[in-house]
Amino acid sequence: MNSNKKATIVVDAQFGSTGKGLIAGYLAERDQPDVVMTAWSANAGHTYINAEGRKFVHCMLANGIVSPKLTTVLIGPGSQMNAELLRDEILSCADLLQGKTILLHASAALILQKHVEEEAGPMTKIGSTKKGCGAAMIAKIRRNPDDNNTVGANGDYMEEHIYGPVREAGVFIRTATNAEYMAVVYDAERIQVEGAQGFSLGINNGFYPYVTSRECTPAQVAVDVNLPLAFIDKVVACMRTLPIRVANRYNDKGEQIGWSGPCYPDQKELDWEKDLGMEAELTTVTKLPRRIFTFSYEQTKAALEVIRPDEVFLNFCNYLEPDEVAAVIGTIERAAHELKVPGPMPLARYYGYGPTVNDIDLDMRHQ
């Protein structure tokens, strides 16, 4: 049994889309965890592009599967899982997962078609991705024995929709009891946990009701994957030089029918073309244009106050001039100093200048 401090948690300190998938892949290749953990929902995408240009776009499967020492993938009890999506992601990476084990916690929730249909109408008003995640979570919370949507209660469904096809591809996968799941956690040599979405979207720390259906803090991520807090020895928080929110929603006539929510008082919403001279980014899941904002001291301070990261990954540095990036770094350091965040400075240890692992630097570029 290995019970020493051994886990890294990757979280988002803004509104999402900060490059968690990119830094997760980078760290997995560098730190080589044998166990990777997630408890995602199907409403957020995570992208990693390796040094050879292979692209991984996952909503269910950890990007840490690229670890050279990987043995086990754990999907935690706090997940709201789209089984077909997980199946497809596993099959697309079957070459990397040969001889590996994938365990799905029996208490993870399944997103069924009825949950997607339940969110189809009213959730448009708050910019929801409408993937059924909240509805699946609510169904689990209701605890109706006649409507049990946990993985453990739907063995036939899991066998038909995911386990059978995945095993045929040579990847071992099954449902795990809590005891079986925790045995892997305790026996692991090194663990990497990947959070989803972002601090400012948290149901308690965000701009309610323009939020997601749970918190996105390291503590919540640990709870959702059943990771003992004592095992955590590093928290990496991801930020963008220019934070984003998901798109507003419009009908076929071009009329706005949904708003994804406000920003912090010291932020300004920017126009992709007029202010930045570039095409708008599209969201990974909905393929709609993201809203983009200036960097916020208030957002940074609020996030660091709760997250208390050991390191920061500052992404999209290529969107700004070097002096502007330096100003953002200064804002992060000022917030960290005011909050007495421990550890060596600067807090920003990794800098992203593009979409691939080759674009991550350990020093800020000056040209």
Swiss-Prot record:
Keywords for the protein's UniProt record, in alphabetical order: ATP-binding, Ligase, Magnesium, Metal-binding, Nucleotide-binding, Purine biosynthesis
Binding site for ATP: S17, T18, G19, K20, G21, G45, H46, T47, Q197, N315, N318, G354
Gene Ontology MF, one: magnesium ion binding
Essential cofactor(s): Mg(2+)
Pfam family, one: Adenylsucc_synt
Protein residues bound to Mg(2+): S17, G45, T284
Protein's pathway: Purine metabolism
EC number: 6.3.4.25
Residues reported to bind L-aspartate: T284, V285, R290
GO biological process, one term: IMP metabolic process
Broadest EC class assigned to this enzyme: ligase
Residue positions binding dGMP: S17, N43, S128, T129, R143, T212
Annotated catalytic residues: S17
InterPro entries cross-referenced by the UniProt entry: Adenylosuccinate_synth_dom1, Adenylosuccinate_synthetase, P-loop_NTPase, Phage_PurZ
Catalytic activity as recorded in UniProt: dGMP + L-aspartate + ATP = (2S)-2-amino-2'-deoxyadenylo-succinate + ADP + phosphate + 2 H(+)
Function text: Involved in the synthesis of the atypical nucleotide dZTP (2-amino-2'-deoxyadenosine-5'-triphosphate). Catalyzes the condensation of aspartate with deoxyguanylate into dSMP (N6-succino-2-amino-2'-deoxyadenylate), which undergoes defumarylation and phosphorylation respectively by host PurB and guanylate/nucleoside diphosphate kinases to give dZTP. dZTP is integrated into the viral genome instead of adenine by the viral DNA polymerase. This Z-base probably completely replaces adenosine and forms a triple bond to the opposite T-base. The resulting non-standard viral DNA is called Z-genome.
Family of the protein in this entry: Belongs to the Caudovirales PurZ family.
Protein known as: N6-succino-2-amino-2'-deoxyadenylate synthase
Organism: Salmonella phage PMBT28
